[in-house]
């Protein structure tokens, strides 16, 4: 039994999209996926990408992925990582694959001088919450995620700017 973690390549576009769809199904959010394989490939494999993906392979086959991008802390004056997605196929859970994906990303943070890793987890996903706690992550109950998207974003974005303020 062997585990390998590697950066996604353009040849992985279909795989990354399939894993995103599997994650959405697990999270009961399939109805939210409106991206395409092309959309993901365009950002992941751009000449200067801003979004990155690591693929986990178990015995040479795809086992999971981590999709992430840089964020920034004005308090620390440095970048960090926002882990947008992490997913291990259900049949392969419990083998340390998710932990290996997280460890690789943590090592990259340390090597680059980035100060933290952040992620969001659904409140019903107790196994994931316990896993994050077990590796030292703090669940920040005093913060809430706010999202402006879709029609609300369009409506707000079309407001006229305030002049002379």
PLM features: what roles do these ranges have?
Residues 17-43:
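Conserved GNAT-fold acetyl-CoA-binding loop/helix
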Residues 89, 100-116, 138:
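Conserved acyl-CoA
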Residues 55, 61-70:
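Conserved beta-strand in the GNAT
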């Amino acid at each position: 039994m062997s585990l390998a973690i590697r950066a996604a390549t353009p040849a992985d576009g279909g795989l990354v999209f399939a894993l995103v769809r599997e994650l959405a199904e697990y999270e009961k959010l399939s109805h939210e996926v409106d991206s395409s394989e092309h959309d993901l490939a365009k950002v992941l494999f751009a000449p200067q990408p801003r979004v990155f993906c690591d693929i986990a392979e178990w015995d040479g086959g795809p086992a999971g992925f981590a999709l992430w991008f840089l964020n920034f802390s004005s308090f620390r004056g440095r970048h960090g990582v926002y882990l947008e997605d992490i997913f291990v196929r259900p049949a392969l859970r419990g083998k340390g694959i998710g932990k290996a994906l997280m460890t690789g990303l943590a090592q990259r943070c340390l090597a680059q001088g980035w100060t933290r890793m952040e992620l969001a987890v659904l409140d019903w996903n107790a196994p994931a919450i316990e896993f994050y706690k077990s590796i030292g992550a703090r669940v920040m109950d005093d913060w809430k995620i706010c999202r402006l998207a879709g029609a609300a974003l369009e409506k707000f974005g079309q407001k006229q700017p305030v002049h002379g303020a």
